[in-house]
């Protein structure tokens, strides 16, 4: 099967996919006809394409945006890029605020489509709301810990929920459990999981928490349990579900210690296998469906 045939099969199967980080290519998630396993492909405007890993894609996307902190490219602190391949286009908006929070908003859409006069930016490219998917990547250092998140916005919403302001106040209890499990993990080197902890019966959200299981390597860290608790609590307190049904926050100390916090609505397909929900920097993952409100 030729490159263009594969490309068309990818677009036909999934319609639209995820992000772009350069002017001559886009990234599409799809699979070859007759195969059930999705892969991530980098597709160039000349029709050539090759498979990439999730980490390669994320490094490409964030690597361009990291240049925004360089004084020589200060204009990249606020910039936008549009790339198109055949009938699929991707629009990437970069922003770095004064507190160092990096936000990358991505929309992926098919053309030609109906014009959306409700948005000047969308109207310029003839983007139809129903044919567009939105995703956001964020990263920030909180309490000395690297915190990152990636989200999809869905066409339907679960009940509005503020994780920091809930009457059930789950954040403090969750982070206390994270702290105690982290202490144990650093001494026993076993990794740990907290599975399906119901945090609010009114809206049916549950939480699953895990450290990466790297044996003794996951114990060799300078990250204190208090720092991890502080970062987790501040990140969770900034979260609002909006139109999100499942998301993940990733924490690491820049070394070997890694912690993933998955919050999942009972309406989400992910409830059947929460550990299959990918997280930012998740090793070996070629998918994305995790979340952050940019920790504001």
UniProtKB/Swiss-Prot annotation:
Glycosylation-annotated residues: 46, 71, 122, 146
Family listed: To yeast YER076C.
Protein name: Killer toxin KHR
Parts of the chain that traverse the membrane: none
Gene Ontology MF terms in the entry: toxin activity
Transmembrane helix recorded as keyword: no
Purpose: Kills sensitive strains of yeast.
Signal peptide annotation: 1-20
Keyword terms, alphabetized: Glycoprotein, Signal, Toxin
Any one GO CC term of the record: extracellular region
Top-level division of the source organism's lineage: Eukaryota
